[in-house]
Amino acid sequence: MGGPGLYSGIGKKAKDLLYRDYQTDHKFTLTTYTANGPAITATSTKKADLTVGEIQSQIKNKNITVDVKANSASNVITTITADDLAAPGLKTILSFAVPDQKSGKVELQYLHDYAGINASIGLTANPVVNLSGAFGTSALAVGADVSLDTATKNFAKYNAALSYTNQDLIASLNLNNKGDSLTASYYHIVEKSGTAVGAELTHSFSSNENSLTFGTQHTLDPLTLVKARINNSGKASALIQHEFMPKSLCTISAEVDTKAIEKSSKVGIAIALKP
């Protein structure tokens, strides 16, 4: 289905290019599939001297998907998703965590050729209600994102965005943090080169500060991707990602502060196996 998509998708291409898969931790993920369909994913992440783990089970039956996650903090998170249950383009999501009794939430997503609507409400006595929408076409869209805390009767957030897309570029403008910050992002595919570039500029009105991040990625071959980025603080990062088996990836990334070269750089590695 065409259309503007959801509000959360505005500027996502640039963010993925600039931030996705960069890490300084050591992460290992293993996904297995049982004979009758359910998928089980185990993840272990080492952050400095701390190791955290998570195990996830996913079961699909027609248009119903059930995800159950358990982590090393003794939390169990369940998400039930129903696609096209009441009407075409409508997705219903129920999520809750144990033992957090205030974590329950119901979410509705609706995609149309000229609109993408997302509404959610917490399952508590005084819930937070969130409503976001993107309106327009796949080429030009405007959107807004609002959250109301019914306990205080105050807006927890109100944001707005504008997006322009054509065959090889995506540009977006986001007004965030209740109007306190303005972010412009840009994503461009260099024709027939396997290369994409992106940039993100954020201005804070309250502090009058700017932050700029520029990045690029290049497909060396169908199985290998390299990325690099640098920001105005002088932090530079690079990664290489290789698909060594179908759907199995090895990603090595590094970060260095160019203004303090004498400090040791940070290196992260992530291995995702899907045998």
From Swiss-Prot:
Cellular compartments annotated: Mitochondrion outer membrane
Task: List the keywords (alphabetical).
Answer: Ion transport, Membrane, Mitochondrion, Mitochondrion outer membrane, Porin, Transmembrane, Transmembrane beta strand, Transport
Q: Name one GO cellular component term.
A: pore complex
- For this UniProt entry, which residues form the secretion signal? none
- Superkingdom is Eukaryota
* Molecular function GO terms recorded: porin activity; voltage-gated monoatomic anion channel activity
Gene3D superfamilies per UniProt: Porin
Enumerate the Pfam families for this protein. Porin_3 (PF01459)
Q: Which CDD domains match?
A: Porin3_VDAC
Task: Supply the PANTHER family for this chain.
Answer: GH26960P-RELATED, VOLTAGE-DEPENDENT ANION-SELECTIVE CHANNEL
The record comments on the domains as follows: Consists mainly of membrane-spanning sided beta-sheets.
Instruction: Name the job this protein performs.
Output: Forms a channel through the cell membrane that allows diffusion of small hydrophilic molecules. The channel adopts an open conformation at low or zero membrane potential and a closed conformation at potentials above 30-40 mV. The open state has a weak anion selectivity whereas the closed state is cation-selective.
Q: What is this protein called?
A: Mitochondrial outer membrane porin
Q: From what organism does this protein derive? A: Triticum aestivum (Wheat)
Q: Which gene encodes it?
A: VDAC1
